[in-house]
């Protein structure tokens, strides 16, 4: 993934994961990579990967089960809100 200089890396990674959730590549309830795996996958610092999951949890996009990992939210309302916000973002970028 190529990162843009004017947007923080953690936000760009969150946006990519949002796209994966919306398109079904990451279905609701799917297990996300560990923090270290995410860091390797995106070639980012493990602290940045940790921040990605922390911010996603604050936005209710995912949840963590101690000892089991981090999972995509199963809340349909959150999923719908993600789709709507991504659609709005796409429309505003297009116009």
What are the language-model segments listed below?
Residues 1-31, 37, 41, 81-95:
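Extreme N-terminal segment that seeds HTH/winged-HTH DNA-binding domains in transcriptional regulators
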Residues 9, 16, 48-51, 59, ...:
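A generic structural signal for solvent-exposed, polar alpha-helical segments
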Residues 20, 25, 46, 63-65:
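Short glycine- and Lys/Arg-enriched binding-loop motifs that mark or flank ligand-binding interfaces
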Residues 31-63:
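N-terminal helix-turn-helix
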Residues 58-95:
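HTH-adjacent hinge/linker in prokaryotic transcriptional regulators
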């Amino acid at each position: 993934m190529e990162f843009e200089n004017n947007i923080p890396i953690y936000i760009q990674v969150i946006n990519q994961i949002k796209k994966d959730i919306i398109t079904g590549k990451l279905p609701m309830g799917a297990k996300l990579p560990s923090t270290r795996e995410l860091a390797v996958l995106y070639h980012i610092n493990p602290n940045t990967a940790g921040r990605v999951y922390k911010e996603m949890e604050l936005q209710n996009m995912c949840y963590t089960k101690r000892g089991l990992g981090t999972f995509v939210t199963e809340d349909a309302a959150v999923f719908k809100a993600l789709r709507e916000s991504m659609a709005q973002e796409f429309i505003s970028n297009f116009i």
